[in-house]
Amino acid sequence: DTPFECPSDWSTHRQYCYKFFQQKESWDDRSEYDAERFCSEQAKGGHLVSIESDEEADFVAQLVAPNIGKSKYYVWIGLRIENKKQQCSSKWSDYSSVSYENLVRGNVKKCFALEKKQGFRKWVNIDCVEGNPFVCKFIRPR
């Protein structure tokens, strides 16, 4: 009973597979140019990356930093603020709860990205329609 391996061009960390995509997409504008939708099409259970510990944050930063173009400053992650009847709830796009936080306090834009000047370790909220590279994540099937 061999454990499932991530596809050859994906990186493995614990029970997940990760891949950094250079192309610039919006977070989720319900169009064909949409990072969350793109991730969901890459693998069953695929989403924009959720980051649930310092260790995972380090792993994702190391995946992004050597591979990102010089002119690119933000990388989408799967966190978005959703307004529901005046109550804001932050949720990862894979529906995991936000128990680990690494925010740079900013404005009230709705979608979160890793920022280059923070070494791709801190989360900043920026406009969801901006085109940015992104990281996808899915759990390895058993």
UniProtKB/Swiss-Prot annotation:
Signal peptide: none
Domain C-type lectin: start-end pairs: 13-137
Domain of life of the organism encoding this protein: Eukaryota
Disulfide bonds: C6-C17, C39-C136, C111-C128
GO molecular function, one term: toxin activity
InterPro entries tied to this protein: C-type_lectin-like, C-type_lectin-like/link_sf, C-type_lectin_CS, CTDL_fold, Snaclec
Expression across tissues: Expressed by the venom gland.
Claim: Disulfide bond is one of the keywords in the record: yes
Compartments, record wording: Secreted
Family statement: Belongs to the snaclec family.
PANTHER family according to UniProt: PROTEIN CBG13490 (PTHR22991:SF40)
Additional notes on this entry: Negative results: does not induce platelet aggregation or serotonin release from platelets.
Name of the protein this chain belongs to: Snaclec GPIB-binding protein subunit alpha
